Amino acid sequence: MHIGKIIRQELRNQGRTVTWFAKCLYCDRTNVYKIFQRESVDSELLYRISRILSHDFFKYYSRELEEDEGEEEI
């Protein structure tokens, strides 16, 4: 799972711009592009992003955890 790509896709799905997102995060566009390149994101930042985009990005980690637990039972 690559959370940065998932965040970028959700931003596109909502029709939001990188400039808008950067303003909401109180950072510049360069930092937003760096977030898009990350495979993982600090939980506090992910929480802020989830609130800004009204999208639960933690569910992707929960889903992955459930899949991992299912594999261990086999």
Positions of PLM-derived features:
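A short, Lys/Arg-rich alpha-helix, primarily the initiator
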Residues: 1-20
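Residue-level detection of the helix-turn-helix DNA-binding "recognition helix"
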Residues: 12, 37-38, 51
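Short alpha-helical DNA-recognition segment
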Residues: 15-33
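The DNA-recognition helices of helix-turn-helix-type DNA-binding domains
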Residues: 28, 39, 64-67
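DNA major-groove recognition helix of helix-turn-helix/homeodomain DNA-binding modules
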Residues: 44-60
